[in-house]
């Protein structure tokens, strides 16, 4: 996933209403725009604008049946985002493991030498 696509996706998912729309679609399956709007205390036009942002991010698709617009969740972009966050987590896990190893090594050195970098009489300083 390129940076621009990821940015659009994260921006779209960054809004509470859009996350609620996406969650509803995942839980209930594809829905008409009017049925989706019935779940929110806002105008049909406002819900449509949120859906448009989700569409642009690839998080939902729209198909038309006559005059009805049916909206469905698309989970593939979420999987790609999960992979990106997984990569970040791996980097942090490695950094934390290195920090832990460094701290454990210092503790072992202190035990061998009998030092712990603490003054013997803290009040004397």
Residue ranges and their predicted role:
Residues 7, 15-19:
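Short alpha-helical elements of helix-turn-helix
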Residues 11-14, 23-27:
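Short, locally clustered residues in the helix-turn-helix/winged-helix DNA-binding domain
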Residues 1-5, 24-27, 31-35, 39, ...:
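C-terminal regulatory/oligomerization modules of transcriptional regulators
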Residues 14-15, 66:
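Alpha-helical hinge/cap motifs
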Residues 64-70:
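Short, Lys/Arg-rich nucleic-acid/phosphate-binding segment
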